[in-house]
């Protein structure tokens, strides 16, 4: 029994399909990726013979580009992609740790290790350098610290823009880089040395947004 075409289905996409396509000719993209320019009437006939929908995906091209595909499946793929994207956005958290322009090496290493771990887990991070009292006169130290952070975290992230002063605070943002993280994890795995869990941060230090 021949499968019923989906021309009566109300599409969620803004594409023209089947009889809605009225241009003289179109460029067809076949399921195997090959392409061919043909008269629209022939393309519609071909779609019907192969039990596909003719879906216009690039209306402004010359000639317009159409795909031979099942509209229902295409909508499902688009919906799944959107849901996966929303899910990923929901699980991404902005984590923040605070530093001072005179942060000592031990504190710097400890907090930077936590920032690195946050990034490896896919979180954005913000390093906030706080200038207390008259320490604001040492802005250059804050900027130097921002560069040290950038260098230290470059193995798993990219800095998002330049460090930005707001009042007596200097903000530095970092975005996780999946390729860098994957490469970092591979190198870690090759060492064969089990990674020890980090000591927990004080409650006042672990900030989420």
Swiss-Prot record:
Keyword Nucleus in annotation: no
Signal peptide: none
Domain of life: Bacteria
Subcellular location: Cytoplasm
Biological process, per Gene Ontology: ribosome disassembly
GO cellular component, one term: cytoplasm
Keywords: Cytoplasm, Initiation factor, Protein biosynthesis
NCBIfam families: infC
Summary of the function given for this chain in its UniProt record: IF-3 binds to the 30S ribosomal subunit and shifts the equilibrium between 70S ribosomes and their 50S and 30S subunits in favor of the free subunits, thus enhancing the availability of 30S subunits on which protein synthesis initiation begins.
Quaternary state and interactors: Monomer.
Name recorded for this polypeptide: Translation initiation factor IF-3
Origin species: Chlorobium phaeobacteroides (strain DSM 266 / SMG 266 / 2430)
Gene field: infC
């Amino acid at each position: 029994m021949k499968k019923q075409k989906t021309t009566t289905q109300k599409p969620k996409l803004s594409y023209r399909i089947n009889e809605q396509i009225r241009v003289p000719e179109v460029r067809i993209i076949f399921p195997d990726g090959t392409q061919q320019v043909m008269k629209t009437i022939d393309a519609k006939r071909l779609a019907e013979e192969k039990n596909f929908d003719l879906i216009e995906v690039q209306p402004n091209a010359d000639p317009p580009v159409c795909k031979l595909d099942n509209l229902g499946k295409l909508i499902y793929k688009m919906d799944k992609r959107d849901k996966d994207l929303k899910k990923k956005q929901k699980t991404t958290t902005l984590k923040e740790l605070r530093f001072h322009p005179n942060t000592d090496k031990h504190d710097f290493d400890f907090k930077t290790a936590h920032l690195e771990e946050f990034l490896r887990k896919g979180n954005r991070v913000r390093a906030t350098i706080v200038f207390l009292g008259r320490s604001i006169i040492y802005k250059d130290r804050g900027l130097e610290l921002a560069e040290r952070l950038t260098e230290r975290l470059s193995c798993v992230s990219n800095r998002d823009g330049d460090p930005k002063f707001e009042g007596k605070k200097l903000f530095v943002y970092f975005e996780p880089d999946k390729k860098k993280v994957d490469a970092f994890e591979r190198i870690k795995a090759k060492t064969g040395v089990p990674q020890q869990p980090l000591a927990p941060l004080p409650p006042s230090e672990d900030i989420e947004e």
